[in-house]
Amino acid sequence: MVETYLGSLPSTGRSETWQNVGIKMPDGIVENSAIKGIDPKSMVRVIFNGDFEYSKENSHILSSLEGVMEIKLREILREDMGGTYGVWIWADPIHYPNEKYEFNIMFGCAPENVDTLTQALFAQIDSIQTFGIDIDYISKVQEK
């Protein structure tokens, strides 16, 4: 059905290409609050971004880090601390228009748990930067 519809659309005969409209992430730390609804609930989103040498190997490394962080933060924030139902993590290696990456971590929690859970998140990041990644977590990511 879609093919029939799309196939019947007229062609404009023009060639199109993408255009860089200059959208970029803000510099530094940005904190925003929005108050909506009646029930108190917080949504925490931490985004890291920066320059990135785009390659298949680097994209794989970024994806593997995404998998490790997903497991570690689920274990700590959800299972150990009981502070959230789930942690969502996604990493984006970006090739065009500029080579960069974005690494997103997001979770919902009660407003009174925001600081505690955010500190635990950054403690895990510091731990990985200082001590590296335990081989058990690498094995778990490879099993996925």
Where are the regions that the model predicts?
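M16 family metallopeptidases and their MPP-like homologs
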Residues: 1, 41-55, 78-144
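An aromatic/glycine/proline-enriched structural segment found at the starts
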Residues: 1-42, 48-52
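A generic secondary-structure signal for well-formed alpha-helical elements
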Residues: 2, 6-13, 72, 125-132
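Generic hydrophobic, helix-prone segments enriched in Leu/Val/Ile
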Residues: 21, 64-71, 111-112, 118
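Active/ligand-binding-proximal structured segments within catalytic/core domains
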Residues: 46, 56-72
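Active-site phosphate/pyrophosphate- and oxyanion-stabilizing loops and adjacent acidic/basic residues
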Residues: 75
